[in-house]
Amino acid sequence: MSPTSFFLLTMLLVLVTETAAKRPRERFSQAIEEFSSESSEANSPKSIVHEEVYEEKKFKRNMVNGEDGEDSKRASAGEIERSYLRKKEKQRFAQEMDK
């Protein structure tokens, strides 16, 4: 094996091991977060439904009261509902991407 090949293989090995050494910590912390969220969902699945209902009522109340700005005062019921549904879809998409 030539010295150049040996050097390049050594450098490649160093880079790979450094990268691999950083990942387990990230994966471990991510795994802990996923496990804690899964266990909390398993322990209280009803709370998730209640949370969504609460968020929906809160969002509609804020839209009716005009707490989200001047444009929301002029919004029709259909626009309010579409806006809420888009917001919930984005949240679900973000949750799916986090998994």
UniProtKB/Swiss-Prot annotation:
Highest taxon of source: Eukaryota
Keywords: Secreted, Signal
Transmembrane segments: none
Signal peptide: 1-21
Induction note: By testosterone.
Record protein name field: Seminal vesicle secretory protein 6
InterPro entries: Svs4/5/6
Tissue: Testis.
Entry's family note: Belongs to the SVP2/SVP5/SVP6 family.
Localisation per UniProt entry: Secreted, Extracellular space
Cellular component aspect of the GO annotation: extracellular region
